[in-house]
């Protein structure tokens, strides 16, 4: 019978809860205001996320570590099934429809916990030596990062695949890989980047890069700038947030939600959200010193911290 380790209550990290709860609450309020249907879905996802957190918190994950490879390969199978059973939207197959419901499942999203756990499992079983992982171990770990990367990129969803790629290798960088390997990778990437851009990227992917680097903002970015300016210092009431209320601000529930955050809560509200994210990321990464030899926990907190940092940075920079 599985028993709950009572020590987890004495070592509970209250800082994470204090930082995560207001972020979730602000997100739920904003999405609900912008779109009631999506707000209801956001509430369901928040509840499911809380239950998943509670499950991971109470279960002795290390005693059940033998299940982690099984979960990883189940999720790989789901990624493979997208090509056969996937629902196509806007020219991409990224979702699986849940039978008898109106909900869809995005395997690339639910893959993330098993991805983190698999890296933690592998590194916990064979920690890095003093000078970092050598080429053989690095290649083995890279396989578990590159396999889902290529599957997700082929959907096509290069954005999610790239995030997974950065988190995976970013975690290895923090945990420890021999510096000669990183120098070699840097040279290969620097030389091959122009060829990849010219021959492998699709036109819309090139356009996104061009729009991001362009001095002249796109229509969507112009509308987000107007929304940010409309918010002022303290923000506007919901009915006075005209950019979102009259649908000028595109995709205000996801891509441009930070612009809506400032339109509603002003510069002060936007600064508060950024401050909460900054504290959460620094707190997670600072746990490296406290955990030290506990590689399972170190991999988990580093990967989660990197995920949060990348998504927060991308969403803010788009605005």
For the regions a protein language model found, what residue spans apply to each?
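Hydrophobic alpha-helical membrane-interfacial segments at the cytosolic entry of transmembrane helices
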Residues: 76, 141-143, 147, 179-196
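Helix-loop-helix junctions and helix-breaking kinks within/between transmembrane helices
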Residues: 34-40, 139-171, 201-202, 262-270
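Hydrophobic, glycine- and aromatic-enriched re-entrant/interface helices and adjoining loop segments
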Residues: 89, 93-95, 183-272, 293-296, ...
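Membrane-helix boundary/helix-loop-helix interface segments in multi-pass membrane proteins
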Residues: 2-11, 15-16, 22-155, 318
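Loop-to-helix entry and N-terminal half of a specific, functionally important transmembrane alpha helix
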Residues: 289-319
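Hydrophobic transmembrane alpha-helices of multi-pass, membrane-embedded glycosylation machinery
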Residues: 50, 161-172, 188-190, 209, ...
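Transmembrane alpha-helix boundary/anchor motif
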Residues: 51, 59, 118, 200, ...
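Hydrophobic alpha-helical transmembrane segments
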Residues: 44-48, 264-284
């Amino acid at each position: 019978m599985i028993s709950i380790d009572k020590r987890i209550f004495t070592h509970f990290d209250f800082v994470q809860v204090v930082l995560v709860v207001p972020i979730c609450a602000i997100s739920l309020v904003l999405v609900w205001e912008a779109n009631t249907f999506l707000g209801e879905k956001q509430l369901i996802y928040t509840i499911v996320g809380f239950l998943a957190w509670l499950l991971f918190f109470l279960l002795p994950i290390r005693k059940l570590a033998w299940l982690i490879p099984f979960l990883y390969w189940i999720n790989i199978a789901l990624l493979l099934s997208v090509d056969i059973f996937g629902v196509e939207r806007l020219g991409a197959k990224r979702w699986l429809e849940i039978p008898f419901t109106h909900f869809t499942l995005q395997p690339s999203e639910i893959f993330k916990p098993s991805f983190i756990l698999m890296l933690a499992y592998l590194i916990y079983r064979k920690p890095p030596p003093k000078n970092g992982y050598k080429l053989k171990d690095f290649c083995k770990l890279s396989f578990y990062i590159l396999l889902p990367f290529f599957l997700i990129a082929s959907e096509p969803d290069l954005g999610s695949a790239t995030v997974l790629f950065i988190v995976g290798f970013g975690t290895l960088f923090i945990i420890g890989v021999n510096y000669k390997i990183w120098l070699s990778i840097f040279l290969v990437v620097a030389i091959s980047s122009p060829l990849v851009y010219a021959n492998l990227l699709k036109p819309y992917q090139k356009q996104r890069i061009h729009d991001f680097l362009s001095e002249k903002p796109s229509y969507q970015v112009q509308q987000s700038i107007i929304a940010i300016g409309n918010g002022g210092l303290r923000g506007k009431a919901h009915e006075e947030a005209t950019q979102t209320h009259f649908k000028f601000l595109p995709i205000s529930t996801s891509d441009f939600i930070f612009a809506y955050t400032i339109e509603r809560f002003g510069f002060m509200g936007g600064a508060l959200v950024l401050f909460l994210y900054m504290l959460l990321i620094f707190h997670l990464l600072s746990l490296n010193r406290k955990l030290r030899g506990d590689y399972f926990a170190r991999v988990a907190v580093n990967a989660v911290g990197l995920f949060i940092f990348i998504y927060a940075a991308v969403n803010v920079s788009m605005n």
